[in-house]
Regions:
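Bacterial N-terminal signal peptides
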Residues: 9-19
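Sec/Tat signal peptide C-region and signal peptidase I cleavage site
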Residues: 23-24
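Aromatic-residue-lined binding/catalytic grooves and analogous aromatic/hydrophobic interfacial grooves
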Residues: 27, 31-481, 498-500, 518-521, ...
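C-terminal capping/lid segments that line or modulate ligand- or cofactor-binding pockets
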Residues: 67-89, 94, 135, 147, ...
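Bacterial N-terminal signal peptides that target proteins for export
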Residues: 1-11
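Extended, hydrophobic alpha-helical segments in both membrane/secreted and soluble proteins
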Residues: 418, 485-499, 512-526, 670-673, ...
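Asparagine-centered strand-capping/turn motif at beta-strand->loop junctions
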Residues: 215, 774-776
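Active-site neighborhood of glycoside hydrolase catalytic domains
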Residues: 489-491, 496-520, 533-535, 542-549, ...
Length: 827
């Protein structure tokens, strides 16, 4: 089997070799970016740059969890801000071990009906043992995402002494900050009469990371630069001013049934341009002396995209080196502001004069800081911009930032919630085009997903289980307790519908969303089995990563009819029917979908008053489990709503209360999901309490989410939860301030987006909305629900009064015309 050392398009070539195995389909070339309806910042929603939108500290990062992230989507870096030595940990999104290969367990097709039979006979323990050996993939795990390496800058003092002889004591006036508005990390160190400033940013425009070193004072800039990686790489110098690294992302032992020792080949390049000094290469490092300023250009590439990564890096470095650093920075800032500047949020007092770690410590000690919540909200948006751009890979478990060769859970795409949570804030916080990398990965994974559906399940369409990687593998991995769950593809397909629902881009719906949703539904139509009472149930499956207790006291995982499966199927079928209506698609197919939806079990209320997690009313041995999968119908689904299904909403509340009473929410991402649940239940107090808990219990000094360890999903889930507290549009209406906490009595948000492609600004005082501005990008009549206890007083269209038709429940209908501006006031 040849090693995969090819471009993304040449995944085709590797898959062609693999296709010699019966039924093994080849991978597609890199898909074109989806058609997007870009939202451009306008004078109405372009907020004034605020000094408060920064993370800042009085000391360098003591460890990786204190370093500050920058990223361009494809490239990422963690900046430590050292005094004597700067460490910049580097990532490139496709530095990934492994290869395209057939991972299907050859015994799976024959074992599947046996596993189903054992579960039906009340023998799920035996079923799990069989599935673990006969269905789980070979090898059992997927390879990891890896660090590129580290750039170390060892500074010399004014007398030219090396860093090893200098003190690393933090000097007075030290500053380390991350400016979210400009996407720039700054370190400022004063020694004697000279202040040294280091500015770092990752440019999506120019494909490079830039580090600018400047001084104010008499002493010159002097340092030694080295590249390093723990293993599987070599470093050399080129010319007098360039460091080069070549390596391969390798994992595994190469033994039979295990991962082969192969992965993408990568190349990294660093060039230093000094003004007024000298740069020389010696001992595998670059030495800068006597400089007034120095500019470091960093880039990397791999064989995932490039046939010749070294040549690609040379082109990017050469192009960037021709431009003044001021032009590189201006282009970077403009590109970042085009996205980041669309949304602003103001709540609480401005405490930005306090260091970020001190503000976090106050919250941990029991204090409240609404402004820190606003900063956290914008930090989530910043991180999505930095880790997911059209043309990059999607944000993985750690976004783009990983310092390890074998990171926790492989830093992969865990698609039983974590990857989906990464993209919850994309549409509502006006970053819809950043969804594109996820759609591209789905297209890649569909290829293996079709083969797995056909060869493992005898089904049409495509299936994904609980994990995938940059190669798009679709097999069940890790073990039966985790891997035997077939709803990953169906859940991911809902993200394409969401993008349509927020943009109303029918071309996207037809060309990108419909094919994926249809194939996901085709699999479910074949996979779901009808029981004796006529219900369509999944199985063998599981409620992600959770277990249930049998009447005899045994604990099992595999089941027939996990509630989440039915809820995801219901969501997919419902959206597919809506899409078919918009597109006037295959009526016969839609009739099958409609008939199948009618046979899905509705969410059931168990003996504790809770929503059942399985078709049977089982108890679980871990009642505070981190996954709360059976509340999918509440969030991100829409099947359960307080007004539409009040009984189910009450049962969802009981479910949350029981989980929390038993220690639930103990992981960062789980706590973030809980914020969203309470916001959907319109319980502002609980949503706010869990936002504070997320900050106090699951947030690292650099505001990264702490599972523990770091996972980025909690950051994105927290940002989405704050948005849900301020605006909801999932229930067929635009609900204003549905979960506004008393702790935020006054504030304003601009640039949020509601389904139907309506951009909104909301201002409130004394806990009551005072003014809402609607900017529709797609026309139509919308139901607008004012905040609880308020009513719409007037609606003006470009300064002219227009009618708002009242509904019996207090909401109003407003006809919106594309391109107009509507101002709503309240009483």
């Amino acid at each position: 089997m040849p090693t995969t050392r090819t471009t993304l398009g040449a995944i085709l070539a590797v898959a062609t070799v693999l296709a010699a195995a019966p039924g093994l389909a080849q991978r597609p070339a890199a898909p074109a970016p989806p058609q997007q309806q870009h939202r451009v910042a306008t004078p109405q929603n372009q907020h004034v740059r605020a000094a408060g939108l920064r993370l800042w500290y009085r000391q360098p990062a003591a460890d990786w969890n204190q370093a500050l992230p920058i990223g361009s989507g494809r490239l990422g870096a963690m900046v430590f801000g050292g005094v004597v030595e700067e460490r910049i940990q580097l990532n490139e999104d496709s530095v990934w071990a492994g290869e395209v290969r057939d991972r299907i367990n050859p015994a799976a097709r024959e074992a599947l009906p046996q596993v189903r039979r054992l579960i039906a006979e009340g023998r799920p323990i035996e079923a799990e043992a069989l599935a673990d050996t006969a269905i789980i993939s070979i090898p059992r795990r997927l390879p990891p995402y890896q660090t590129l390496g580290d750039l170390h800058l060892a500074f010399a003092d004014t007398a030219g002494h090396a860093a090893a002889t200098m003190t690393d004591a933090v000097p007075a006036g030290y500053l380390r900050e991350l400016d979210l508005d400009r996407a720039i990390a700054v370190t400022r160190v004063t020694r004697g009469a000279t202040t040294f400033t280091r500015t770092a940013f990752a440019s999506a425009v120019d494909g490079v990371i830039v580090v600018r070193l400047e001084r104010a004072g008499p002493d010159p800039i002097a340092f030694t630069a080295r590249l390093s990686r723990e293993r599987d790489a070599t470093v050399r110098t080129e010319r007098h001013d360039t460091l080069l690294m070549d390596g391969e992302a390798i994992t595994g032992t190469g033994k039979a049934g295990e991962e082969r020792r192969t992965g993408v080949r990568f190349h990294g390049a660093v060039r230093i341009i000094a003004d007024g000094g000298a740069v020389r290469a010696a001992d595998g490092a670059l030495h800068v002396t006597g400089a007034r300023t120095a500019t470091i250009l960093i880039t990397a590439a791999t064989t995932f995209r490039e046939t010749d990564p070294a040549a690609a890096c040379a082109r990017m470095i050469a192009a960037a080196a021709k431009r003044p650093v001021q032009a590189l920075q201006a282009a970077h800032e403009a590109d970042h502001q085009r996205l980041f500047g669309r949304v602003s949020l103001r709540i609480g007092d401005d405490l930005s004069d306090l260091p970020t770690d001190e503000r976090l410590a106050r919250v941990i000690a029991g204090g409240d800081d609404p402004g820190l919540a606003a900063l956290y909200f914008q930090y989530g948006r910043y991180l999505l911009i930095a880790s997911s751009r059209p043309g990059s890979l999607p944000a993985n478990l750690q976004g783009r930032w990983n310092a390890l060769l074998s990171p926790p859970w492989g830093s992969k795409y865990t698609i039983n919630i974590n990857t989906q949570m990464n993209y919850w804030p994309a549409e509502v916080t006006n970053l819809g085009e950043l969804h594109a990398p996820l759609f591209d990965l789905i297209d890649i994974a569909r290829v293996d997903g079709r083969r797995v559906a056909r060869e493992m399940y005898g089904a049409r369409g495509f299936v994904l289980h609980h994990n995938t990687d940059l190669w798009g593998h679709a097999v069940p991995i890790d073990g039966a307790r985790y891997g035997i769950w077939q709803m990953g593809g169906a859940w991911l397909s809902l993200h394409l519908w969401d993008h349509y629902d927020f943009t109303r881009d029918q071309a996207f719906l037809r060309t990108r969303a419909w094919p994926v949703m249809r194939e996901a539904a085709e699999f479910l139509l074949d996979y779901l089995q009808e029981d004796a009472s006529g219900r369509l149930l999944s199985g063998p499956s599981s409620s992600p990563e959770n277990q249930y207790r049998l009447p005899n006291g045994q604990v099992a995982t595999l089941a027939i009819g996990a509630s989440m499966d039915a809820q995801i199927a219901h969501a997919l079928f419902t959206r597919l029917l809506a899409a078919g209506g918009v597109l006037n698609e295959d009526a016969a197919f839609l009739d099958r979908v409609r008939a199948a939806r009618a046979k899905l079990p509705a969410p059931a209320i168990g003996r504790h008053g809770q929503l059942q997690e399985w078709a049977e009313d089982y108890d679980e041995p871990e009642p505070g489990h981190r996954h709360i999968s059976h509340l999918f119908a509440l969030h991100p689904g829409t099947q359960v709503t307080p007004r539409g299904t009040p009984d189910l909403a009450r049962a969802a509340r009981v479910t949350l209360e029981r989980r929390l009473a038993n220690g639930g929410g103990h992981t960062g991402w789980s706590r973030a999901w809980i914020i969203n649940f309470w916001a959907r239940l319109e319980d502002a107090g609980e949503a706010h309490a869990h936002l504070r808990a997320l900050l106090a219990k699951s947030t690292l000094p650099n505001l990264f989410d702490n599972h523990p360890p770091f996972q980025i999903d909690g950051n994105f889930g927290g940002t989405a939860g704050i948005a849900e507290m301020l605006l909801q549009s999932h229930a067929g209406e635009i609900a204003l301030l549905p979960a506004l906490p008393a702790a935020w009595p006054a504030g304003a948000v601009t640039g949020l987006v509601a389904r139907g492609n309506v951009e909104l600004d909301i201002t409130w005082e004394a806990g009551r909305a005072t003014r809402v501005v609607l900017r529709p990008r797609a026309g139509g009549t919308h139901i607008v629900r004012p905040p609880r206890g308020q009513a719409v007083a007037s609606v003006d269209e470009d300064g002219r009064r227009v009618p708002a038709l009242p509904r019996a429940d207090g909401a109003v209908d407003i006809a919106l015309t594309t391109g107009r501006t509507y101002v709503v006031t309240f009483r």
